[in-house]
Amino acid sequence: MEASRGPPRVKNKAAAPVQISAEQLLREATDRQEEALQKPTQRFEDLEELHEYQGRKRKEFESYCQRSGFNLKNWLQYAQWELEQKEYARSRSVFERALNLHANKVTLWIRYVEAELKSRNINFARNLLDRAVTHLPRVDKLWYKYVWVEEMLGNIPGVRQVFERWMEWQPDEAAWSAFIKLEQRYGEYDRAREIFTRFTMVHPEPRNWIKWSKFEEEYGTSDRVREVFERAIEELSKYGDEFVEERLFIAYARYEAKLHDLDRARAIYKFGLENLPRSKAMLLHKEYTTFEKQYGDREGVEDVVLSKRRRHYEDLVRENPKNYDVWFDYARLEEASGDIDRTREVYEKAIAQVPPTQAKRHWRRYIYLWIFFALWEETEAKNPERARQVYDTCLKLIPHRTFTFAKVWMHKAHFEIRQGDLAAARKTLGRAIGMCPKDRLFKGYIEMEQKLYEFGRCRILYEKHIAYNPANCSTWVKWAELERGLDDLDRARAILDMGIAQPVLDMPEVVWKSYIDFEEEEGEYDKTRSLYERLLDKADHPKVWISYAQFEINIPEEAGEGADEEQEQPVSDEAKARARRVFERAHQGFKDKEMKAERVSILNAWLVFEKTHGSAEDIEKIEKQMPRRTKKKRKLDDDTWEEYVDYIFPADEQVGKNLMNMMAKARARKQAEAEAAAKAAAADDGGESGE
């Protein structure tokens, strides 16, 4: 059963030794084919037999035509047979009868005309062609036949008359081209120009105008060629930009370049690039680039590149006017070109695209357009008055009640300083702080006054800044650094003390560290210890304890009279003892609070300290206290389990073992007492039974 399924399998798939080709198969089939029967040749002995034969054939044709009159082939065979019999009248009658049924068949008209021409009935053929083009005026083949007949007869006015009749129907481009070529053959160039005029009105495609320009280039003058191109651009512009194509400008510019009128060619290229959409001017720009490389200089080539990029950016901002990144690139392009008027125009168009909402995220990129515009007016255009106007307009535009931009205020103030008007700069920043206070505005204003060495103004500004935002740690630190730089340590200490006393700070560790570093650098070690103790009361963190221990180590000892201050002094035993006491306090505190992770951090730092400053016994002592890591599981609120890392300390483990031993001894003692009591009770029961 399985062997019978499917096609038979070929066991030997190798090529046969004798190959049979398709050509061989066809040749054998042809050789074996029997010869077809040939119709015997018919001979007529006299006219009577001929007439009999003709009558019989006519009856057959008539029968065919009556049965299938809509079959044009029967009529054509009938008419052709009558022509072979030299019966022209009968043939003409057959054609006319066929036309009554098939008046729209072009083939019938052509065969009828050719039959009359073969019979040398020229006037009959002309009449037929006239009837044909009148009945089927949209069939170009009949018109071409009519024109050919008249031209073969040498009737050029008649040909021209036929063409005129034809052109009234506004045929396709090939018919107009044939009419023009007729006039060219006979040297009637003015007539050809007149035909071109009508031709371009009916078919105003650019290719037809280019044909006209080539005609004028061959038979006319350069002025006529220019007139054709200019007229083409003017006429096509009336229909809209979609009818104007880049190849028209390319042909015009190439012609001018051929005449070595490079300025005119360059102007044509630029005109085309400015008036055509970028999507339709890719080839034009490529041709312009090639032209500049061939005939222009470096400036010309750069102008081509700038023109291409300019068109690209114009298309992008036309599609999305709120794409500020494109405006940035567009403005930089114009800045690189050095055209002040064009650059200013681009910036003005860009800043006119105000964000539609008052959300600051929509304004972040937009505001840089104003800043770049003002900087360009100041540095490149050398017009400070216009730059000031740009800043003022920008500040009026920003909704300061909702948000503000400190960078704009700062740029305006720096601009006024560069112009030598310090009062205007202070007025600008004062107005900014009064209208919309902001940390960055205070910071910039203070930095400006510091550079001017106006420290009294800096103190006033710091006071206002603290009143505005007392939680800003950077303000406290910077103010203290200013006072320390002015050698007013008491004021700096008071400022830092006020800073750490604030109930809310964004980064309190910064103020504490600055205060501690300040006291340490000034050599006030007791005050530094006091600060550490105060900090530990607020934040019991391992990092604070480690920093505290490092501080105790780094306290320099009082050097003798002959000691070199620059030479590094060894750490004293007293400093090591102080540091160890700090570590012991930290370790014991975290141990009491059962804070294992913090306890491990302290032990690691303590071990590093002992490896650096301690002995082998000290290191061993700390290593014995180091815990071992173990993985445990705990149940969560959603009845799932998670794995976590726990630390087991040797001291805690020993305490646990001792506690277990004590509990075991207590259990054993209780069990012994219970057994003794049971034995005593049993003895009492036995004595009573004996009595």
Swiss-Prot record:
Gene Ontology CC entries for this record: post-mRNA release spliceosomal complex; precatalytic spliceosome; Prp19 complex; U2-type catalytic step 2 spliceosome
Listed Pfam families: HAT_PRP39_C, HAT_Syf1_CNRKL1_C, HAT_Syf1_CNRKL1_N
Main location: nucleus
Keywords recorded for this protein, A-Z: mRNA processing, mRNA splicing, Nucleus, Repeat, Spliceosome
Keyword Nucleus: yes
Recorded superkingdom: Eukaryota
UniProt HAT repeat ranges: 52-84, 86-118, 120-152, 154-185, 187-218, 220-258, 260-294, 304-336, 338-372, 382-418, 420-451, 453-485, 487-521, 523-554, 574-612, 617-650
Subcellular location: Nucleus
InterPro entries the UniProt entry points to: HAT, HAT_Syf1-like_N, HAT_Syf1_CNRKL1_C, Syf1-like, TPR-like_helical_dom_sf
GO biological process, one term: spliceosomal complex assembly
Alphabetical list of PANTHER family matching this protein: CROOKED NECK-LIKE PROTEIN 1, PRE-MRNA SPLICING FACTOR
Known partners and oligomeric status: Associated with the spliceosome.
Role summary: Involved in pre-mRNA splicing and cell cycle progression. Required for the spliceosome assembly and initiation of the DNA replication.
Family statement: Belongs to the crooked-neck family.
Annotated protein name in UniProt: Pre-mRNA-splicing factor CLF1
Name of the encoding gene: CLF1
